[in-house]
Regions:
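Glycine-rich anion-binding loop/nest that anchors nucleotide
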Residues: 224-229, 259-268, 288
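Amphipathic alpha-helical packing elements
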Residues: 160, 164, 168-172, 176-179, ...
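Alpha-helix-loop-beta-strand connector modules within alpha/beta enzyme cores
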Residues: 102-110, 160-176, 240-260, 313-327
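Short, small-residue-enriched loops and turns at beta-alpha junctions
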Residues: 150-151, 185-187, 231-238, 267-270, ...
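N-terminal amphipathic/basic-hydrophobic helices that include classical n-h-c signal peptides
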Residues: 1-18
């Protein structure tokens, strides 16, 4: 008899070769959660946003040591309040693991300097980096950001879909969760075009929802989504309209019952807090955020002492506020894990448990 494994809200029968991969993914995913199975994850993998902080303050291009210093400040002051931390392999992994006090480790795979055409963007891996290396480095999940909008040029759509599908297949092979971040973006001929990693102004809600629908298909093997707000952050500041509420409902429906967390895109603290409330009402299981938590402290940069003080006070207070909200309102994955670890014929586990292909 083949073993059964729960994944999301779907009860699936896997062959013995696949069972071990999903079991391994579940073990890693559980490490990213609180005891109540919520995600409270801190991002320090940012590259251009950190580069911009340094360039703006010093009037010149960043150097390697300055980027590491900024990331060290964030990691040492805030990681103990997170269930997991998202790190990059250029600056964070080789320098900051000893300062990480969270229990889970998510590692970035994609190159931040993407190729762009008039109506498309093209993602790629960091040079000399791979899913296999992330697994060997002790990662609990592979994070990939895929720029995507359904009305982009066909060549871009095909490339992005094949890119994500390849990574999903590699993550399954190496039994490590695949965390996919999706961001819509402005075309080069749009009035608000930018290559900066900031929230797109006047973004199209349907583009976001349709993008999630595409990558929720089983062929991409996504285990957890990292999603942006389906509406502009300005729409989250004060009175929440029915249109905004409906947008979050439609976003949740697009995930095909896969776990999802919310990203901040550097939006204001009030907007992000309200964004989380709406997301949690619609089944989100936590957050994976960075700039909204720590960026204000870097207004003091290059005064390191004041940056450190800001992180220890304002940033700590805010992440605690997010954690309280998450604990009270986020969708728990307890049943997801409990049912995922239900294995038929446990007495024959070693016999049925397959190896890597």
């Amino acid at each position: 008899m083949k073993p059964n494994v729960f994944f999301g809200n779907l009860f699936l029968k896997f062959n013995t070769e696949k069972m071990n991969q999903n079991l391994g993914k579940l073990i890693h995913l559980k490490k990213l959660c609180t005891e109540n199975s919520h995600f409270q994850m801190l991002a320090v993998d940012q590259r251009p946003p950190i580069f911009n902080i340094i360039a703006s303050a010093k009037g010149r291009k960043h150097n390697y040591e300055e980027v590491v210093e900024c990331k060290k400040l964030i990691t040492s002051n805030l990681s103990h309040l997170a269930t997991a931390i998202l790190m990059d392999p250029h600056y964070s992994i080789p320098n900051l693991l000893q300062y990480n006090n969270s229990k889970g480790l998510v590692i970035t795979l994609e190159e931040h300097d993407f190729k762009e055409t008039l109506h498309g963007r093209y993602s790629s891996d960091i040079d000399n980096w791979s899913v296999e290396k992330i697994k060997k480095a002790g990662g609990d999940a592979v994070k990939v950001l895929a720029w995507y909008r359904p009305d982009s040029e066909k060549k871009s759509l095909d490339h992005q879909q094949k890119y994500v599908q390849r990574i999903g297949e590699e993550c399954e092979k190496y039994s490590i969760p695949f965390l996919l971040e999706l961001l819509v973006y402005p075309f080069q001929d749009d009035n608000n075009h930018t290559k900066e990693y900031i929230e797109q102004k006047q973004k199209n809600t349907q583009h976001i929802i349709d993008s999630v629908k595409e990558f929720a298909k089983e062929k991409y093997k996504v285990d957890i989504f990292k999603l942006e707000s389906p509406v502009d952050s300005n729409d989250l500041e004060n009175v929440i309209t029915k249109e905004t509420e409906d947008a979050f409902k439609n976003l949740a429906n697009a995930t095909n019952n896969k776990p999802w967390v919310v990203l901040s895109s550097g939006m204001g603290k009030t907007s992000f807090y309200n964004c989380l409330k709406l997301a949690y009402q619609n089944g989100a299981s936590g957050y994976l955020a960075g700039r909204t938590i720590w960026l204000d402290a870097f207004k003091n940069y290059p005064n390191i002492e004041n940056v450190d003080k800001g992180l220890k006070t304002e940033s700590v207070n805010y992440i605690n506020k997010l954690n309280d909200l998450t604990a009270q309102n986020a969708h728990s994955l307890k049943d997801y894990f409990k049912k995922g670890f239900e294995i038929q014929e446990p007495e024959n586990f070693t016999k049925n448990f397959g190896g890597f292909k």
